[in-house]
Design a protein with these regions (language model features):
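Boundary/linker segments flanking structured domains
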Residues: 1-21, 26-33, 38-163
């Protein structure tokens, strides 16, 4: 397993000793935000077609819950950590839950990793998610205010949408 800053990951400034198939994204408080897998290349899972973050000429757009969280917290999130795990790393970490004679794939191990590490943004397999204590960014505050306003307009008593 290697742990690098998100900037190092984005700029592809790291050396991979093996084929990494699972990633763990942490916030600036060292809390685990998200766990995901890739059958090809983790960098492409983040920044390629249908990735977590869309990369433009002079902008980044979050396309998933974890991508939005990272982009909303730039520039601070450049220093957040991402861990890259190999299949063997995951098997060692989950050894207590596995049959030592079993044959495992990363798709089979991902639920165990999510259940053990309890990331705050994963929904599937996450029966007891952790808490994200990252302070709200200005972008998040503006988005929440706009959503609250839309909710009030639609559902409150004097809404133009009610008959």
């Amino acid at each position: 397993m290697i742990e690098i800053t998100f900037r190092e990951f984005f700029e592809y400034k790291y050396h991979e000793d093996g084929f990494h198939e699972l990633y763990v994204m942490k916030n600036g408080l060292d809390e685990i935000l998200y766990i995901g897998i890739s059958s090809e290349n983790i960098w492409n899972r983040w920044f390629g077609s249908r990735g977590h973050i869309m990369v433009g000429m002079n902008y980044l757009i979050g396309e998933s819950s974890v991508g939005r969280k990272v982009v909303d917290h730039l520039p601070d999130s450049w220093d957040w950590k991402i861990q890259l795990w190999t299949l063997d790393d995951c098997m060692t970490f989950c050894a207590g839950e596995l049959n030592p004679n079993g044959r495992y794939t990363i798709k089979w191990l991902e639920p165990f990793m999510i259940q053990k590490l309890r990331p705050s943004l994963n929904v599937i397999y996450n029966l007891n998610p952790g808490i994200d204590n990252t302070p709200l960014s200005e972008r998040e505050k503006k988005r929440m205010a706009a959503l609250d306003k839309a909710y009030r307009e639609i559902f409150e008593k004097n809404s133009k949408w009610k008959k």
